[in-house]
Structures are given as structure tokens and as C-alpha cells.
Amino acid sequence: MAENFELPAGSGKGKSVVILGAGIAGLVAAYELDRAGYDVTVLEARDRVGGRVWTVRGGDKIVQTGRTDQHATFDQGLYFNAGAARIPSTHRVILGYARKFGVKLESFVNDNRGAGWDFGGHVRPERRMVYDLHGRVSELLAKAIDQKALDQAMPKGELEAFRQFLQFYGFLDDKGAYAQASFASGFASEPGGYAHAPTQLPALTLKELLPNRAIGFPYFFQSINDMQPTMLQPVGGMDAIARAIHAQVKPRVTLNSPVTAIRRIGERVRIEHGPGNRTTEADFAIVTLPANLLERIPNDFSAPKKAALKGINYLPSVKVAFEAPRFWETDNDLFGGLAWTDRLNENVIYPSDGFMSPKGVLVAAYVAGWTNQDNPQRFAALSDAERFRVSKESIEALHPGKSQLLSKGVTVGWGLVPYSEGVGALWNEGPGGARGQQYAELLKPEGPIYFAGEHLSYVGLWQEGAALSAHEAIKLLQARVADQGETRNDRIVRTAG
């Protein structure tokens, strides 16, 4: 945890470190090294800290390469998490920094059984899709058991227990059939007062539950380890943690300073950077820049390092957000959660903050290859106006008559965001999660130069991975400093003798 990570006090005295990038990895490294006594300088290309943790508020400018700049005009207090948007409760390190610096958190509703699933031209609530699928799968398995098709696969006692489990799991009738939708799937008419008994829905068929391949991931989503409840978000915007760490090291951070070259000067490093033609020299460097950008920066890296930096693909996720009155709450009883669709916008995120307030920011598209791996590239290629159109059409399907209430739209295509060009590295992992020699090479220091970032962790695409990688780089750097100290002391003893 962050509270338990601490270098020996004063262990960095007399040593200097330049850190490239003020995203989470860079900020964490700066904070930990600074309090250990290192002379720290952080160079950040943007006019803000946080990197891919980016909260857009009214008055902010959105720059995408090759496109007209956008200017957010959200009402006061409203915001859009254009990048990172949720934190799993198991991400102890980043949550540790939130705790340490007093960042207030609230629940992020990552699943809502009432939210719509729009697939195959039909919109149905998630609860009906999920629990009717439970019923249909259980029905098939119960039939197989009753027809003795599984007698050779399981012992009799286990089969009996499994058959009983299916009865409850799938809401089957006494004959093992899923003849009518369970109450878990919702109602044709809701239960009410004195004379309002509920009426059940007809059970959906497997064809209706599995209309196309795109629907597979939404069924699986909630089972992903990092997507299970409880999920969290900082109150007021995801950038709160980055800003809190930045506050601890603000004098050390220089914004608007893009790196133009990374050079080794003997046992030290020299960084060439903007604005203008400036240089910063230090004993050590920690590079937290994305690999796809680092590859293009002139450097003195070894041939193996340069080769390892090539060909790492980054996910070009795209989001679209609108301000709107909270019709999803007033008309559909949706307080947070996600809607899913086989349309190009893939995913809709209902805000988990400001419940019952007049307005909110609705993320009407979050395209990351959830339902089709080609969707991020296809959606990113659309003009901003086309992204808005596709997103509004999706909201209209989910909430008929309400798309006209969407206003103040903004869109961020991460493949076009300067100094990012993607939200995170995509590793083609082998058996057991192995990433091979390329990954191993990227982890290695280059003399006095160390490396960190979400791409150098097994918690990629998350703030947790960025923070963990910073800790790893710091430990390597600290070990070298300690070793240099021991070597120096040994020389002194030998000279004195």
C-alpha cells in the first residue's frame, strides 16, 4: 500500500533525478523521491498534470491532432472523465494515496440491472437478459442430466446436487423447464399497493438472448476481476488524486515542457526539452512516457531497448459526453450503471455522482472494443459531428424522445490526443500472461535511466499499474544509489588503510 512504501529518510541527499511525465507514474515517483531527499525535477509536456487521467470541466479546451479544438461549456460543478473513470476497491496503492492526501471517494456504479441492452434492434433491461439466460442455460443442463447425458461426466451424488442447484439458479419449474421469466428478470407490470399484484414476463428465447456475437462481452463484463463491485471514484472528478499528489511536489513540476531528446552524459543524463531549447541534467532519470511516443524521441538507448520500443500498440478509445437533465433517473430509475449496445458507440455510462440533482453529464459513447475489436478505429475515424450523431441515435433507442435533451457535446479520441496517442498499451500475452523478451527488455534500466508507466505493469490501463511501476523503478534506482554509497565507503576505507 502507498502508506507502507517509503524510502529511507535522507537516502537521496546529494542526488538529482529528472522525471519525464507528470501522469500518475511520474507524480508518484516525484513524491516518493522528493521526501527521501532527492533533488527532483518533473518535466510535463501538457499544461496540466495527470496524463491519461483527465477530467474535463466547463472552460477546458480539448485538443485532438488534425481537428478543430473543442471548448467544454458544462455548467458549474459538472465534469466529464475523459480518461480514467473508475477505481476497483482492490487497487490498494492508488487508493492508499487517496487516503493519505484526504481525497474523498464515492461509489462508482459499474452495473445496473435496470439499464438497457440494445442488441439486434431490440432494447431490453439487463436484468431480463441476464436472468433469462441463467434460466435457459440451466434448463438445457437440467435436461441433459434428466436424459442421463452427463452420467459419465459426473458421479451420481454430484449430479443430484448439481441438478438441485440448477433448479434454484435458473428458476426452473418442477419439470426442469424455464417456462416463464423469473421475478429476477423483472415484471410485465410491477407489484404495487392493495390490488396491484405483479405479472410475469414471457421468457426470452436463446435466439433473443444471443442475437449476435457482440452481446457476449456484456454478459461477461461484471465477472472481470477489476470490474467487480465495489468500484470507486473521487468526488468531483477522477483527477482529484493526481492533483493531490501534485500539490505535494508542485515546485518540482514544470509544465509545457515536451521532451525532445534523452541523452547520456557519462554516468549522468541530459534531457533536451521545451519550451524553446532547454536542457536539464541530473544523476538519474525516470521515463514514464508511453512507449509509442518514447520510440520517436531521439535518445542514446541501446539497440535492444530501441528494438523493444517498436510495435507496441495503444488502445485508441473514444468517448462522447453530453450535458442533460437527468431523464434517466426521473423516467427510468437509473442511478449510475452502464448500458450496452451493438451500435458503434458500444457503451453508455450513467453518472454515479449528483443523484437527483437537476443535470448531469451522460457519457453517451465509450468505445474500447467491448463488442467489436474494430470499433475504436472505426469510431475514431468519424468526424466529431458524426460521433455526436451516432451517440444521440443510441440514446434515442435507449430513451425514446430524449436525445433532443442532450447538449454541450464533447468528444475525446485518445489516439488523437497529443502526448498520449492512446489510453494504454495492448500486450499480446502468452501462456500464463507471459509478455516475452520485448517486455523484459523494456523493464531494464539504461545506465542511469529507469522506466515506469502503466505499460510496465501487469495492471495495465489502470492508475494502479502506473503507481506500482513507479515504485518498482524507484526501488531499482534506490538500490543503485545505495550500492554507489557502499562502493564509495569501501574506497575511503581502502585509501585510509
List each language-model region with its residue ranges.
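Core domains of carbohydrate- and sulfate-ester-processing enzymes
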Residues: 127-148, 198-213, 292-293, 428-444
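Rossmann-like dinucleotide-binding core of oxidoreductases
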Residues: 124, 132-146, 151, 294, ...
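Mid-domain catalytic core of redox enzymes
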Residues: 255-367, 398
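Short glycine/proline-rich turn/loop motifs
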Residues: 7-11, 71-80, 217-230, 247, ...
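Conserved flavin/dinucleotide-binding core of flavoenzymes
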Residues: 2-6, 28, 36, 268, ...
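Active-site/ligand-binding neighborhood in enzyme catalytic cores
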Residues: 145-258, 265-268, 281, 297-298, ...
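N-terminal glycine-rich phosphate/pyrophosphate-binding loop and immediately adjacent elements
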Residues: 4-143, 494
